[in-house]
């Protein structure tokens, strides 16, 4: 964005709890009635490009953002009520806990909106959330007020009150570290004792008799089932911590009716789960450490290889502690694991056995990795590869193969598509970043100075990537687009033939017109090239457009300049669909659009394809609406 443009620190909204299929266009339709929007961005996973369930909507005016927050919070989009709050970019303010309260023992029927409506009487709410899982509400939630005073008023008035006939607890929000510290302090001063494994013949009186010798007890209870039969465990609550500690020390592990009983501090369910989880994680970490560097992963196994054969093949390299072929339904899955007693033996086995043919197949042998490690490693490799590809403007290719223009990437390597924010056309003029390249001249083509060389045609992206645009909602303009060259056959065209076909040679600058891609500049020591006169694209009533004019314009203006010249031509062919088709065509690369402006046949071909795509989309929408109306499902 232009640094001189005004900033709107409080005109940005966070929109959460989104359905995975919600797009920027849907959010634009939803929020645009509140006021002019600068941009919309649905946050997505870098690799899978799936929605993360939240988005940011940036308004031009804070008053419009406030109106949207007041009137649209908890509105339903694609069957899910969305949660809107002010975007707070400073994490210290979000995590400080100031103004944040915790509410528990909530009725299952209380949702985000009901909680918001209940607590909004005490002050301005920044965020409000009932914690849910796949089964619905978990019975607790959080409300973050703008001020600490509002939070204290809510605690004072609402703690112990009835909400939907349930007495709720309302208190100051405490971080996990604070809660664990409090639990630890309380645990040291426990008075409640848990006893288990004492059999079915135990009752309250007998349990009191057993533990009464340690000190006065407030309560004694043996837990029973519906028939009154003991469940084998119970509780004794002492008056003093010292008596409880003495009972645990003396009674834990003693035999009672031929059974060894357990006596310990009574724990809440959350405490027990936390402790078990911690023990499990510790065991898991110990196991990982123990097998680090000694466990091998073996794949591409022949179907006839079993555990014994696998052990036999690897036994020459050292002492094997375990060998296992993974099976499913009695059949080998084609891979297994071999664990050695030392890392040296495992390393030797990898060196000797990787690639060796056993039975009928060459084995793949490597150190075993946990799933998380493997995924992290693959992701890291992928990101490094993408970074290296982006760093090289033109990958080294066969000199006789037509080279892609500078700024394009070879399609043989998969590319991530970094989706940009959604910019309405009314705001594009305000979002003009400075050009990232010199506009004095185009980068010379690698074949330019070779006499008689074949000049490759610029690759044209397949039209199937275009999507129909709504007349009310503009297209999402991606700031980084990768040309797909693998699906397009590029026909070589001799320079002489090209010169004969056209009165003047059109030299299109080898740039990918995208705001997020840094185009390479000419080398300082490069030989000066003869600048050939570029033909201008003439559209009646418009200023002539040349490739150099386009290159010197800011990125957002480039599409506008092209759109202004495309629209009258398309309007002459399809007056009612001109706006939609123009928006669809503007997703094509600028060099291709220039060619279409010069070639009426090429333009007509693309327009016909766009009309076909648009008609197919409209037919699909009509069919979906018919299905929804027949089944009574409301359309969003």
Curated annotation (Swiss-Prot):
Pfam family membership, one: MLLE
Name where it's found: Cytoplasm; Cytoplasm, Stress granule; Nucleus; Cell projection, Lamellipodium
Mind listing the UniProt keywords for this protein, alphabetically?
Answer: Acetylation, Cell projection, Cytoplasm, Methylation, mRNA processing, mRNA splicing, Nonsense-mediated mRNA decay, Nucleus, Phosphoprotein, Repeat, RNA-binding, Spliceosome
One GO term (biological process): CRD-mediated mRNA stabilization
Q: At which residues is N-acetylmethionine found?
A: 1
The cross-references to InterPro entries, in alphabetical order and at most eight, read: Nucleotide-bd_a/b_plait_sf, PABP-dom, PABP_1234, PABP_HYD_C, PABP_RRM1, RBD_domain_sf, RRM2_I_PABPs, RRM_dom
PABC domain location, by residue? 542-619
Q: Does the keyword Cytoplasm apply?
A: yes
User: Residue positions of the PTM Dimethylated arginine?
Assistant: 493
Domain of life, per UniProt, equals Eukaryota
Q: Which residues carry this modification: Asymmetric dimethylarginine?
A: 493
Q: Which residues carry this modification: Omega-N-methylarginine?
A: 385, 419, 432, 436, 475, 481, 493, 506, 518
Is Acetylation there in the keyword field?
yes
What this chain does, per the entry, is described as: Binds the poly(A) tail of mRNA, including that of its own transcript, and regulates processes of mRNA metabolism such as pre-mRNA splicing and mRNA stability. Its function in translational initiation regulation can either be enhanced by PAIP1 or repressed by PAIP2. Can probably bind to cytoplasmic RNA sequences other than poly(A) in vivo. Binds to N6-methyladenosine (m6A)-containing mRNAs and contributes to MYC stability by binding to m6A-containing MYC mRNAs. Involved in translationally coupled mRNA turnover.
What name does this protein carry? Answer: Polyadenylate-binding protein 1
Taxonomy-wise, where does this protein's organism fall, top ranks first? Eukaryota, Metazoa, Chordata, Craniata, Vertebrata
